[in-house]
Amino acid sequence: MAGKARVHELAKELGVTSKEVLARLNEQGEFVKSASSTVEAPVARRLRESFGGGKAAEGAAKAPAKAAAKGDAKTAAKGDVKAPDKALDAALDNAIKAGGNGEAAAPPAQPGGTATTPAAQATPEAPARPGPAAARPSAPAPGQPKPPAPGQPPRPGATPGPRPGPAPKPAARTPRVGNNPFSSAQPVDRPIPRPVPRPGAPRPGAPRPGASPGNMPPRPGGVGGPGRPARPGAPRPGGGRPGGPGGRDGGGGNYRGGGVGAPPGGGGGFRGRPGGGGGGRPGQRGGAAGAFGRPGGAPRRGRKSKRQKRQEYDSMQAPVVGGVRLPHGNGETIRLARGASLSDFAEKIDANPASLVQALFNLGEMVTATQSVGDETLELLGSEMNYNVQVVSPEDEDRELLESFDLTYGEDEGTEEDLQTRPPVVTVMGHVDHGKTRLLDTIRKANVREAEQVTVEHDGVERPITFIDTPGHEAFTAMRARGAKATDIAILVVAADDGVMPQTVEAINHAQAADVPIVVAVNKIDVEGADPQKIRGQLTEYGLVPEEFGGDTMFVDISAKQGTNIDQLLEAVLLTADAALDLRANPDMEAQGVAIEAHLDRGRGPVATVLIQRGTLRVGDSIVAGDAYGRVRRMVDEHGDDVEEALPSRPVQVIGFTSVPGAGDNLLVVDEDRIARQIADKRSARKRNALAARSRKRISLEDLDSALKETSQLNLILKGDNAGTVEALEEALMGIQIDDEVALRVIDRGVGGITETNVNLASASDAVIIGFNVRAEGKATELANREGVEIRYYSVIYQAIDEIEKALRGMLKPIYEENQLGRAEIRAIFRSSKVGIIAGCMITSGVVRRNAKARLLRDNVVVSENLTINSLRREKDDVTEVREGFECGMTLGYSDIKEGDVIESYELVQKERT
């Protein structure tokens, strides 16, 4: 036994029990725990000697199987076919021991020598015949390795004999030709009788009867001598799936032909499920069914379900868009939000987003699956697939978002008995410098804020009125529109000496769009040149007909500076409110309102001026406004006093937001901070998607070349003192139209001072920071100087717009215009070791200047462009220019010149772009 041996293997070899072996080892001083323990080779040798196995037993166990097989082969070749059963059993035992535990052994044959394998029974014995049938070489017997090819040295360790210890190994003899499976010369075959197997019980170590040797490693070959050649045309036993055990006369299925008396060859072939039938058609391999763990038998084809058939039919009927087959709709409506991606669309129609991407690519538009897509693209793609794509408006989208949390906005809860009278909300609108703010100062005798509430006596009863001021600048269109939507009555201020101006018309349009009644205040009647009747005539063109002209619009002539007719104006406001409006609200519900303005205060954080429209806002309520949320920590009225609650039509400053809300965002009170945060997060994501879809520039395959060209882009970061100013500045800057070569992009915007975060973002994106009525905080200025970030400060919005427009014009690629200078004809060519080739020229027209651009003409064909006149000499002097009619020498840095060529000189003049 080579190497270490286990105790139970030694016990089986010696024919004793494991306990006896363990006891004997303990007597010899070897500490062995159990029958599965291993012992070294010297210990095993001493153990065999102690049991009296002698050198014969040791030699049988230690000698390689090759020597034993060679001896048997010699005996068979000499004709000694009547070997006793004991010799045969000893040879088989030696072969099994030498082959190891994992080798396959033959099951015991049935009494009488009948084989157990049907394939072996069906194969009759026949004498071997020379010829093509004997061309298959026989394999070595079990226990005998394959003999080496002629001229190849045998493997070391193949010599027989006992091995009591390290001893020199004698050289192996050259095997006979007949035992070499690779030799072309084969011995004359003669029938050799099989040795009679000994009947009895199966020996230890032999496989169980009926076990399949196909699951065992292959053996080198049979025990006997050269094998009997196969019969021509007969099927090979065991070809294909592994079968049952064969008889003693059956050769291995895929083994190299076993000799006479070899152990039974089971089904050969691949490892698979045991018990499969071997064979196939005569002369061919069996099928591979069952091989590599595959189930045998013919594959089953089940019937398709109705759903599978329907899916196949729908796929065949699906429309092909851009060469891609897509799902076919039934005309149903698909609702998508603004800035939806192809993944969102694919999820709605149960399609693959990659198919939609490929379809759009084939149609000429390049987008990704997660990229925001414009509304037109979604509608076009949906119409091709027979879907009606409906892009949800922002109002509907926000309403659906609130409904998902069981919330509503814009409706009073309760019955008619729960509604109570509220003060009117009045917005003052008009053109810039027409006296809006002065009018409010006169009304409240103090500086006005964004929203104020004053008390007016009407019919002997004091009634409060809430005023909202709006800017009159052109850039603040959105603020005027918000003021018109949040108000009940609009006061239109028109200067009597100036007349109707563009912002006046815009304010009229906003008020009429919001269906708000208008009271006209004709201001500055005390100024020289004032004509109130002219104002009435001009406003008639816009549908504002005075009552004295038979209309329903109240006109009041006032002077905000002198305080003239202010009471009549307030009286007109209350009369209009009582006549045309139902000013009632339910104060016993959760508060709802609108953020008029918002800014970032250094000491208090985000501060929002909120107008409560219905319900009551209290300190401690969880609120959400746009994409900002928080909890009310403090409320301040227009006088700077703290208040605990705010009733309908009451303006207050709310402190407690986590971020600055947008001007015009709806305010809503919710039950928990968690709900407020979820609503704010979803609104923020929706806003980002909509902004990405709006700012994405469509790139088609037709203009791909132009899109890939370098485009100048100016990145800006906007910071302002309040949200309305930042919004107005951004809209004004985005409205600048210069050229397609330059682009303006606002990468960030915010309320408050310029921070180090803004500077870092500007440094990373090569942006310019615009500060409107704000300054840099802390070390932001030092960081900007160190990083080279430019910060511009403005307090007038028009100045910022003009400078940004000039910067964009400076980023345009310059346009150069060619200005012809003169022509020179080459009369002679000189060569110099210092300057190279010199052209001796005559100036035929114009003037030639040094360092000017030149082109070389030969027979009126341009030979070279974009040359430079490096040097210019007249006689021996260096000159800057040579005029017509004079000779000169010049160098162009170009060697391919000939006499008669013409040098044309020109200069490029940059043309200013407009």
UniProtKB/Swiss-Prot annotation:
Binding site for GTP: 430-437, 469-473, 523-526
Compositional bias per record (Low complexity), positions renumbered to this chain: 57-68, 98-138
Bias (Basic residues): 300-309
Biased composition (Basic and acidic residues): 69-84
MF annotations from Gene Ontology: GTP binding; GTPase activity; translation initiation factor activity
SUPFAM superfamilies: Initiation factor IF2/eIF5b, domain 3 (SSF52156), P-loop containing nucleoside triphosphate hydrolases (SSF52540), Translation proteins (SSF50447)
Disulfide bond found in the keyword field: no
Keyword GTP-binding: yes
Start-end of Pro residues biased regions: 139-169, 193-207
Region (Disordered): 52-84, 98-326
Biased composition (Gly residues): 236-296
Compartment(s) where it occurs, according to its Swiss-Prot or TrEMBL record: Cytoplasm
Domain of life: Bacteria
Stretches assigned to the tr-type G domain: 421-581
Keywords: Cytoplasm, GTP-binding, Initiation factor, Nucleotide-binding, Protein biosynthesis
InterPro entries tied to this protein: EF-G-like_DII, IF2_II, IF2_N, P-loop_NTPase, Small_GTP-bd, T_Tr_GTP-bd_dom, TF_IF2_bacterial-like, TIF_IF2
Cellular component terms per the entry's GO annotation: cytosol
Family per record: Belongs to the TRAFAC class translation factor GTPase superfamily. Classic translation factor GTPase family. IF-2 subfamily.
Function of the molecule: One of the essential components for the initiation of protein synthesis. Protects formylmethionyl-tRNA from spontaneous hydrolysis and promotes its binding to the 30S ribosomal subunits. Also involved in the hydrolysis of GTP during the formation of the 70S ribosomal complex.
Name of the protein in question: Translation initiation factor IF-2
Species for this entry: Mycobacterium avium (strain 104)
Classification of source organism: Bacteria, Bacillati, Actinomycetota, Actinomycetes, Mycobacteriales
Gene name per UniProt: infB
